[in-house]
Amino acid sequence: MGGIKEFLKHEASGGILLMIATVAALLCQNTFLSDFYNEFLKTKFTVSFGEYELSKPMILWVNDGLMAVFFFLIGLELKREVLEGELKNPSQIALPAIGAAGGLIVPAVIFYLFTKHDSFALGGWAIPTATDIAFALGILSLLGPRVPTSLKIFLMTLAIVDDLCAIVIIALFYTSELNAQMLAVASVCLAALFALNRLGVKSKAAYLIVGAVMWVAVLKSGVHATLAGVVAAFFIPLSFKDEPGKSMLKSIEHDLHGWVAFGVLPIFAFVNAGISLRGVGLDEILSPVALGTALGLFVGKQIGVFGFSFLAIKFKLAKLPEGSNFIQLYGIALLCGVGFTMSLFVNGLAYNDTDAFAYTDKLAILLGSVVSGAAGFILLKFSAKN
């Protein structure tokens, strides 16, 4: 339980910082600071390795680089949870897994219904399927002990399954033209990581160097670079035969949690949440992409997560989290509609980080997430009083 409590503590307080970063980005984009803010996002940074040079604007360093660290942490959490955590026991994973399935299917269907006549817009079908665990737990932290720990663990486990689905979606649907040479380099790195794991190598630096080379290769291959972080994490040893009490995975996970919660995600929010509200009217807000996104998050997520979970409990496929009731479960389902950073990330992949929809796609993510978060907070607070 200690690892779970630490996870909840970091994610919850990090969620509050995410809110501050979001407000800061909106203020920068919609005040006299807008020119400075946009120039900052376009500022190019170059890293050279002998003949090789990697030059990208700030926003792509964040989206491709820092977010790879975030997905690396997700990979570590997934591996630990599968081997010895909440995902090890099929009975414990049943309800969050079924809820996550509903939270994936229903929002995607809603988005499809609004955008089916526009093939480019339809490419964003996965945007409302995501859940921002940091933001959701940040909202839960404001309720303190009013919410049972079992529900917090349910939300955390559902978000982990949700992240796993996001990884698969990115790999299958948001991969551009492939570079065979770079994929070959990435494969060699993969083999090297496997060898390091099997040989019981205890040097974090060795894994870091091979992982960094693999990240560059994947970045150049056409596969999204964040997937390199996930794959690398799967080869970090959970324990060593000669030192069973020592865990490299848990050590790295512990060290990274703070950096990701208080650094990576707030920075990502700051560079991606700068939505221009100038000229945004009712027509833009009621556009197919905006409606599909906002309603997918607010309506689709709550119906999908709660509906599938309710049926699973009624058909005795799973049990209601200990010490909770259906009203509280519905409140958690509402919080799952807080897609924010993950939805913004998928949005960037779907529409190639362009402003093809004049920021209304991002505005819809913000609106859907805020309404979901507010509704979930109010319902959970009300249910605690009763």
Predicted regions and their residues:
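C-terminal ends of transmembrane helices
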Residues: G2-K5, L73-K88, L137-P148, A191-K202, ...
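Predominantly late transmembrane helices and immediately cytosolic-facing juxtamembrane segments
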Residues: E6-H10, L27, S203-V213, A217, ...
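Hydrophobic core segments of alpha-helical transmembrane domains in multi-pass membrane transport
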Residues: L18-Q29, F70-L76, V106-F111, C189-A195, ...
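Transmembrane alpha-helix boundary signature
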Residues: C28-E39, K56-I59, L73-K88, V106-A126
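Hydrophobic transmembrane alpha-helices of secondary-active transporters
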Residues: E51, S55-E84, F234-I236, V260-V280, ...
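Structural signature of hydrophobic alpha-helical transmembrane segments
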Residues: I59-F71, S119-A134, T175-A191, H224-A232, ...
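Entry/N-cap segments of selected transmembrane alpha helices
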Residues: V82-A108, N179-V188, L277-I303, F326-Y330, ...
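Functional cores that coordinate and move charged inorganic groups
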Residues: L140, G144-P237
